[in-house]
């Protein structure tokens, strides 16, 4: 069953195309990633998906319902975890959950029960009476996630769920999301963290300039666009560049540094060290970040 079905979604702002007739779908119990550099069209797409922004044309269906005609019914079945901290600083941790539950007309006794369960799940029970200002960044992020789940949604939309968190807090959030994934929750995730996307997403798309560049499973995309291994060579000279060209090795030439992509880089690593001993060579596994940079470029986006 398709939880999300987007067909030819298009958005223009004063003649500027932000999203250019994209189509994709998300299956039930799937974690689906939406990746792209700044200004690629991710946020615009997400805002159209949860009804904050009308599309110029195209269609969006959630749970088989049209987002424009059936928005009230759809809204009751989704949870949204925004990148910004939108918690009420004047309320306690527990009160933030209860107030949000009122938006969904959840009975008070049920809201109390769900609040207890969610605070326990996200390891926040000991902070239930604390004000939001007293929470660490990781705790606040977990509370935002808990709040997004108060209506027991069938679809969770996560906008940069771990941005700004330290490694410990980040991994704790990932573990909680993996537990929810194992329980059958469907999620749409936007993230700049390639490790996060590789770890959580069953499938993903990479979008740039409003267009979908690729779609697939993380490991398959890595194998196709970046091989199995990467060899990074510093101070690459002309002789080495000719060697790469003659042997038709997939690569990015970054000036003094070359990045080589290969199905098995071990032999290449040995060759570089043997024949080009002056070169500094790093041998590592290919990652989703390699794919992302190959497809979207390395120029800074602001």
Q: What are the functions of these language-model segments?
A:
Residues 152:
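Conserved catalytic motifs of ABC-family nucleotide-binding domains
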Residues 98, 102, 109-127:
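Conserved ABC ATPase "signature" region
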Residues 156-159:
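Catalytic Walker B motif of ABC-type/P-loop ATPase nucleotide-binding domains
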Residues 174-263:
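ABC transporter nucleotide-binding domain
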Residues 90, 131-135:
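Conserved ABC ATPase signature
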Residues 58-69, 73-74:
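Conserved ABC transporter NBD signature motif
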Residues 50:
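Helix-to-loop junction immediately C-terminal to a conserved catalytic motif
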């Amino acid at each position: 069953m398709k939880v999300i079905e987007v067909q030819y979604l298009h958005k223009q702002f004063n003649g500027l195309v932000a999203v250019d007739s994209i189509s994709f779908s998300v299956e039930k119990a799937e974690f689906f990633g939406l990746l792209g550099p700044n200004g690629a069209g991710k946020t615009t797409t997400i805002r159209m998906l949860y009804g904050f922004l009308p599309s110029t044309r195209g269609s969006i269906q959630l749970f088989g319902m049209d987002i424009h005609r059936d928005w009230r019914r759809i809204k009751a079945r989704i949870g949204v975890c925004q990148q910004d901290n939108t918690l009420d600083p004047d309320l306690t941790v527990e009160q933030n959950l209860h107030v949000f539950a009122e938006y969904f007309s959840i009975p008070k006794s049920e809201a109390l029960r769900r609040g207890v369960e969610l605070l326990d799940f996200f390891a926040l029970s000991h902070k239930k009476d604390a004000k939001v200002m007293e929470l660490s960044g990781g705790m606040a992020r977990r509370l935002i996630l808990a709040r997004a789940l108060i209506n027991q949604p069938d679809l969770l939309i996560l906008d940069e769920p771990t941005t700004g968190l330290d490694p410990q807090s980040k991994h704790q959030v990932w573990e909680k999301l993996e537990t929810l994934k194992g329980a059958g929750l469907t999620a749409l995730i936007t993230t700049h963290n390639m490790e996060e996307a590789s770890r959580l997403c069953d499938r993903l798309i990479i979008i740039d300039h409003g267009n979908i560049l690729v779609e697939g499973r993380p490991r398959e995309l890595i194998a196709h666009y970046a091989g199995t291994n990467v060899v990074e060579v510093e101070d690459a000279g002309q002789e080495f560049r000719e060697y790469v060209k003659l042997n038709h090795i997939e690569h990015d030439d970054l000036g003094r540094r070359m990045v080589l992509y290969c199905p098995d880089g071990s032999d290449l690593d040995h060759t570089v060290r043997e024949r080009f001993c002056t070169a500094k060579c790093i041998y590592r596994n290919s990652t989703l970040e390699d794919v992302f940079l190959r497809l979207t470029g390395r120029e800074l986006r602001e």
